[in-house]
Amino acid sequence: MTAADPTLRMERGLFRDGAALVIGVDEVGRGAIAGPVAVGLGVFLPDVKRMPKGLRDSKLLSEQRREELHPEVLAWAPHSAVGLASNAEVDTLGIIAGLGLAAVRGIEALVAAGVPVEAAVVVLDGSHDWLTPALADCPDTSRPRVVTRVKADRDCASVAAASVLAKVHRDRLMIDADGVHPGYEWTSNKGYASATHYAAIDRLGASALHRWSWLKQPALF
């Protein structure tokens, strides 16, 4: 086992402490200059089976390997969802509130599927709990308990699974968007900043999917 291999150690500890289910949560697209931010959620029960072979944080996997793992992760997690906040919502609300909105939408999708979210413990990647305040702003949404862990996407299998779900979902959206708004090379850059992406904005102007507040000032004109 290498340092990059996640385990179920934290999840099983939460189950021993009484959690009825664990929801791994991770986001993708936080730093992009085009497209939505996506939050993946993977739901796991105390009888969780061995994770798919080769599962890792999505950032450590090739695009091909993520696509190969995606159906395995969907089969492994009893329930899953991906919530989105659009580029316009990120511009209007800011990235942290946008992340919260996307996560709330994902949680609402789980609730609609019959998942007892209020009995869950959410494992959130990072040191900052941006989810609890978002839930507090939505009194009609079920509120799970949230715990944070730095490098959870690397170390915790539930969060690694969520990262793959979010990354594949968002990447597919950006590839489709490349056909609608050609020229920005979204099939390759997935909406993230690069010299060629900024050059395309200078040449074509910003599209309806760009985050205007995130663009470098010279690229706006």
PLM region spans:
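RNase H-like, Mg2+-dependent phosphodiesterase core
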Residues: M1-F221
